[in-house]
């Protein structure tokens, strides 16, 4: 989604915003904590979007909601300690479907934790999950087109759902 967000910014503010994808595929919040200094803090960002819920919910990673919250709070605290003016945005994503849901049966609790932390810390939340649920329930074929592997939104889904919602949440 970072590439599609960059394209959306470029379309509105050419050359004024740089989106850096500091994440890595298949990683979860424990990895985020371990790599935060090098991959995020060292870049001195103005804004950081954090979204590890869907991978924290992955059963083989054995990351409880409590540990995921502790990791999330740690990342927030460390980012703000290094740059108090950094805007931190929390984000939920799409529901996993098919085999991916079976591997993440408690995904709702992880997304709710993100909502709770955003509210408690007064952080902006981009809650994509309800939008994705509406798409899934109203037009499964469209959902499948937007999320072709059942877990990762493809470029079209990112361009049509994720990037516009982030821009809207930012008031842009």
Predicted regions and their residues:
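Alpha-helical cap/lid subdomain in secreted, periplasmic
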Residues: 3-18, 31-172
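Short beta->alpha junction loops
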Residues: 21-28
């Amino acid at each position: 989604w970072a590439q599609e967000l960059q394209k959306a910014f470029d379309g509105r503010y050419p050359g004024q915003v740089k989106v850096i994808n500091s994440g890595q595929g298949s990683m979860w919040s424990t990895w985020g904590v371990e790599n935060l200094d090098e991959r995020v803090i060292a870049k001195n960002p103005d804004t950081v979007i954090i979204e590890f819920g869907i991978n924290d919910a992955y059963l083989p990673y054995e990351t409880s909601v409590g540990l995921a919250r502790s990791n999330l709070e740690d990342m927030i605290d460390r980012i703000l300690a290094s740059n108090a003016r950094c805007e931190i945005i929390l984000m939920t994503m799409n529901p996993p479907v098919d085999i991916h849901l079976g591997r993440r049966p408690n995904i709702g609790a992880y997304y709710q934790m993100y909502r709770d932390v955003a509210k408690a810390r007064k952080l902006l939340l981009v809650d994509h999950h309800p939008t994705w649920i509406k798409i899934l329930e109203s037009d499964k074929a469209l959902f499948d087109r937007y999320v072709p592997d059942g877990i990762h939104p493809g470029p079209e889904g990112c361009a049509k759902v994720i990037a516009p919602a982030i821009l809207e949440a930012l008031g842009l």
